[in-house]
Swiss-Prot record, chain B:
Carrier of the growing fatty acid chain in fatty acid biosynthesis. Keywords: Cytoplasm, Fatty acid biosynthesis, Fatty acid metabolism, Lipid biosynthesis, Lipid metabolism, Phosphopantetheine, Phosphoprotein. This is Acyl carrier protein AcpP. It is found in: Cytoplasm. The modification O-(pantetheine 4'-phosphoryl)serine is found at S37. GO terms for cellular component: cytosol; membrane. HAMAP family: Acyl_carrier. GO terms for molecular function: acyl binding; acyl carrier activity; phosphopantetheine binding. Signal peptide: none annotated. InterPro entries: ACP, ACP-like_sf, PKS_PP-bd, PP-bd_ACP, Ppantetheine_attach_site. Pathway: Lipid metabolism; fatty acid biosynthesis. GO terms for biological process: lipid A biosynthetic process. 4'-phosphopantetheine is transferred from CoA to a specific serine of apo-ACP by AcpS. This modification is essential for activity because fatty acids are bound in thioester linkage to the sulfhydryl of the prosthetic group.
Length: 245, 78
C-alpha cells in the first residue's frame, strides 16, 4: 500500500518543519523528491541526508517569474512531476484594522497566487500523462477563521475553493486535487508559544495534544498514492478533533 | 494535403486516439472525434506549441473542425 516507487514529487517549502516531514515521507515510500525552498543550505543538508532520488529547487515564491521557472525546471529535471505538494506558506499576522496592504499582499502572493502559478505550470503535463496528484496544504483556520489572521485565513480558504474548482475541471484526466488541513502541529512556530497560550490551545483540542508533522505527512502520502485515485476535491482535516467539519 | 494539414492531423490522432481515416477536413473535434471541452483546449495548446503561433481564446472558440485549425494556422503563418 501507498508505494510511490517511480513517482516524482515536488514539495514546496521543504525547509519548513511540515514540508520536511512530507518530503521525508514521500521519499521513504520510494518517490523521487524535488525539494523547493528558499534556504539553499538547508535544502542541501536535507538532500544530503535523504541521499538518492533527491533534487533541490531553490526559488522565491513571491517572484512570479521564479515560480514559473520553478515549475519548468522541476518538470524537466525530475522528468515529469506526478505529485505536487503546495506546502509553502507564510504568515504576517495582525489585527485587521491595522493590517497593511503589504502584509495582505505578501501573504496572498505566496500562499495563494504562487499555488495558482506553480499548479498551472505542472497541471498540463499531468493531464497529458493522464495521471497526477495535486495536494495543497491549507489550514483548519481556513475553514474556522482565526482573529489576527484575516490574510492567512483568506489565503487558506482560497486554496480550498481553488482545489475544488480545479478538481472538477481535470477529474476526467485522472489528476486529483485535494487539501490537507492541519490543526495545531508541533513546529518552530508553535514552539514560540508560552505555556498559557499552549494551555489555551490544548483546551480546545479533544486529544489534548498537538499533532506531529508526521500526522500531516501521512495524510499527504495517502492522497499522493494510487490508492486515493477516487478521492478528489476533498479536504482532509488532521487536527486532533479540534474542529469537526 | 499540405504539410500543415498533415501535422495538424497527426496531433489530433495522437491526442484524441482516433483512427486516421476519421480525421478529415470537416470532422468536428467534439461531434465527430469525441473530444470534450478540455481536449479542445489541449489541442489548441498543442497547435500553438507545434507551429509557434498564438491562438487567442476567441479564435480558439471558432476552431471547431480539423479544417478550421488548418486554416487558422495557415493564415497565422502566412
Amino acid at each position: 500500500m501507498f508505494d510511490l516507487t517511480g513517482r516524482k514529487a515536488l514539495v514546496t517549502g521543504a525547509t519548513g518543519g511540515l514540508g520536511e516531514e512530507i518530503a521525508r515521507m514521500l521519499h521513504k515510500q520510494g518517490a523521487v523528491v524535488g525539494l523547493h525552498g528558499t534556504r539553499v543550505e538547508k535544502l542541501e543538508a536535507l538532500a544530503a541526508e535523504l541521499g538518492d532520488r533527491v533534487k533541490i529547487f531553490p526559488a522565491n515564491l513571491s517572484d512570479r517569474a521564479e515560480v514559473k521557472a520553478l515549475g519548468e525546471k522541476a518538470e524537466a529535471e525530475l522528468g515529469g512531476v506526478d505529485i505536487l505538494v503546495n506546502n509553502a506558506g507564510i504568515t504576517k499576522d495582525g489585527l485587521f484594522v491595522r493590517m497593511s496592504d503589504e502584509d495582505w499582499d505578501s501573504v496572498l502572493e505566496v500562499n495563494l497566487t504562487a499555488v495558482f502559478r506553480l499548479t498551472r505550470e505542472l497541471t498540463h503535463p499531468m493531464m497529458r500523462r493522464r495521471h497526477g496528484r495535486i495536494i495543497n496544504i491549507t489550514s483548519v483556520v481556513g475553514v474556522t477563521g482565526n482573529p489576527g489572521q484575516t490574510n492567512y485565513c483568506a489565503s487558506k480558504a482560497g486554496m480550498i475553493g481553488f482545489s475544488k474548482s480545479l478538481a472538477q475541471e481535470i477529474a476526467t484526466r485522472n489528476v486529483t486535487v485535494n487539501c490537507v488541513a492541519p490543526g495545531f502541529i508541533e513546529s518552530a512556530m508553535t514552539g514560540k508559544l508560552n505555556e498559557k497560550q499552549k494551555e489555551a490551545i490544548l483546551g480546545a483540542i479533544p486529544m489534548k495534544r498537538m499533532g506531529a508533522g508526521s500526522d500531516i505527512a501521512a495524510a499527504v502520502l495517502y492522497l499522493a498514492s494510487d490508492e486515493a485515485g477516487y478521492v478528489t476535491g476533498q479536504t482532509i482535516h488532521v487536527n486532533g478533533g479540534m474542529a469537526m467539519i | 494535403m499540405s504539410d500543415i494539414a498533415e501535422r495538424v492531423k497527426k496531433i489530433v490522432i495522437d491526442h484524441l486516439g482516433v483512427d486516421a481515416d476519421k480525421v478529415v477536413e470537416g470532422a468536428s473535434f467534439i461531434d465527430d472525434l469525441g473530444a470534450d471541452s478540455l481536449d479542445t483546449v489541449e489541442l489548441v495548446m498543442a497547435f500553438e506549441e507545434e507551429f509557434g503561433v498564438e491562438i487567442p481564446d476567441d479564435a480558439a472558440d471558432s476552431i471547431l473542425t480539423v479544417g478550421d485549425a488548418v486554416k487558422f494556422i495557415e493564415k497565422a503563418q502566412a
